Amino acid sequence: MKDKEVIIIGGGLAGLTSAIHLSKLGHSVTVIEKNTFPKHKVCGEYISNEVLPYLNWLNLNIAALNPTNITKLEFSTASGKTIKSILPLGGFGISRFALDEYLYRKAIRNGCTILQGQVENILYEDDKFTITTTNAVVLQSEMVIGAFGKRSNI
């Protein structure tokens, strides 16, 4: 059994961003992700420009991913009627494949450990979490972040 400072369960946007943030502050971080990287996710991603200062603080160069600038929103009905709205603050669109891979590589450059495996059990006892994966990895930590998404069965 290996003791870790911080364990993050889930290597999506929340998990990887948390890993980058904590590693920037000097913490030792281990991320457990059930899928391999790079990974496809059937969705696009809109990110508001209001988060740019935070992304800059994390030393993320999102411009290197060639995001699409988004300044308006348009809804349409099945009959073709539309409603349009300007987005004063604006934002950008980027593929999850590209963004997840970028965050994954940044977390590794920051010194994070990424383990591929699915969490099978979480036990909290004596102020410590014991995490067991389906491939028999057992880790312990006083700090665990659950970033496994809303559809997880954990």
Give the ranges of each region predicted by the language model:
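Beta1/beta-strand and adjacent pyrophosphate-binding region of the FAD-binding site
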Residues: 1-14
